[in-house]
Amino acid sequence: MRSATVVTRFICGAAFLLTLGWGIPVHAQLGVGEWVRTDATGKGMTMTVAACCKGGFRLTYRVPIANGQPPLILTVDLPMDGTEVPTMSAGKPTGQTMSARRVDDHHYTGVVKQNGQPYLTSNATLSADGKTMTIEDTLTGTNQKVIETWVKK
């Protein structure tokens, strides 16, 4: 069974990075919709991106859990202005926050904190057609990296 901390460690980099590039009107509709994580570590995870919060995005993750249990559902309302925002599960904060910055039209960077302490940095690259996002997550204080691949449905 995947714990919420392990799961969110691998998906939170994508949470805000996937949509960060669409915080300006020209790109506003590119990120909205359903995304599927296709790498081996995150296979089966989905993310729904919807507009919210004055030009930001609501991200809803569905994370498969072993033994036929219902999926873990995580939600974050991301204002897209670099503000730290909480990750929610069942309407309650998980103790995790996210913040992010857009570098350019196809590159994004961000930090995920757990209980106020940074534990994950992410660098993302959006494909030219806007249909694939590759994210390199690095655990704070280690050389451990996870490469995520998300594809728009």
Predicted feature locations:
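N-terminal secretory signal peptides that target proteins for export/translocation
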Residues: 1-8
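Intrinsic disorder/low-complexity segments
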Residues: 5, 15-16, 27
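Bacterial N-terminal signal peptides
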Residues: 11-22
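Hydrophobic small-molecule pocket/channel-lining residues, especially in calycin-type beta-barrels
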Residues: 27-153
